[in-house]
């Protein structure tokens, strides 16, 4: 199985696209089987079926509601692996250990 990440920002254009690339690079270096997509906060509900973990800035993360085996990771600096990396790895190792190589 591959853990599916959805990067969410206010407009779905700038920050989430850059965050998508940063998360992809970080998870590749961390040997995690993954896919990463991005969207605007207003579109996340239509993207939920294809996501296991939603990553967003802390002020947007509060607007995101998920149920079941889906998780929201709120981060202060979306572009810094030092900020989002440990939080993302904690969720992946706890809930998706089969994706850690």
Curated annotation (Swiss-Prot):
Compartment list: Cytoplasm
Q: Which reactions are catalysed by this chain?
A: N(pros)-phospho-L-histidyl-[protein] + L-ascorbate(out) = L-ascorbate 6-phosphate(in) + L-histidyl-[protein]
Q: What is its EC number?
A: 2.7.1.194
For molecular function, the Gene Ontology terms on record are: kinase activity; protein-N(PI)-phosphohistidine-sugar phosphotransferase activity
Q: Which residues carry this modification: Phosphocysteine?
A: 9
Q: Quote the InterPro entries the UniProt record gives.
A: PTS_EIIB-like_sf, PTS_EIIB_2, PTS_EIIB_2/3
Induction comment from the UniProt entry of this chain: Induced by L-ascorbate. Repressed by UlaR.
Alphabetical list of SUPFAM superfamilies matching this protein: PTS system IIB component-like (SSF52794)
- Tell what the record comments on domains: The PTS EIIB type-2 domain is phosphorylated by phospho-EIIA on a cysteinyl residue. Then, it transfers the phosphoryl group to the sugar substrate concomitantly with the sugar uptake processed by the PTS EIIC type-2 domain.
- What is one GO cellular-component annotation here? cytoplasm
The protein's UniProt keywords, in alphabetical order, are: Cytoplasm, Kinase, Phosphoprotein, Phosphotransferase system, Transferase, Transport
Source lineage:
Bacteria, Pseudomonadati, Pseudomonadota, Gammaproteobacteria, Enterobacterales
Tell me what organism the protein belongs to. Answer: Shigella flexneri
- What is this protein identified as? Ascorbate-specific PTS system EIIB component
Q: Does the keyword Transferase apply?
A: yes
Q: Alphabetically, which GO biological process terms does the record hold?
A: phosphoenolpyruvate-dependent sugar phosphotransferase system
Primary enzyme class = transferase
